[in-house]
């Protein structure tokens, strides 16, 4: 799955027409460059590892985890995917902690792997479900909440109309762009974003990128 050139073109045209403030952001940021990641299991593992820590710390831990996986699979073909559920389950909780994961994140990562191995979460067919059904399927796994599921929908399945109303970055961007005194609540976010539909994912990406314009 990926964002098609036609979808991106239609989204940018729609968003520029429906929202003058967003149109200015689109002009300042430039082309939409997000790419959907094909490694679905790996995307979810990376999301769990990255929760509530800095970008730099998350990248360091992910690098160590991927190196440990490669070391454990030297005799196996990599096929471009460092993550697979069976390999994650071969590590003990203590081994994952030694790599840098907290006990909680190590448990969450193995829980995800077990759900995939058992077939409770079928990542090979999950794209056939609608957005809300995918969210419900994923949040049954400890460590995966609605936000993580929404990030998966956008950045792995390239779903076009996802609005992460609880994302701090988007809320901060909306406050800045629309001149609000405080961070918007869920109702305010949905009201502001209503014109963005059916391209809320594209608009959300531009909101995230708008934060870089102020740096």
Q: What are these regions, as identified by a protein language model?
A:
Residues 24-42, 79-80:
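Short secondary-structure junction/hinge motifs that connect adjacent elements
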Residues 41-45, 88-92, 130-134, 170, ...:
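N-terminal alpha-helical segment
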Residues 46, 63-67, 110-114, 154, ...:
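Generic alpha-helical structural context detector
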Residues 44-48, 52:
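Short, aromatic/basic-rich helix-turn unit that serves as a nucleic-acid recognition element
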Residues 25, 53-54, 58-140, 197:
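Alpha-helical ds-nucleic-acid-binding substructure associated with the helix-hairpin-helix region
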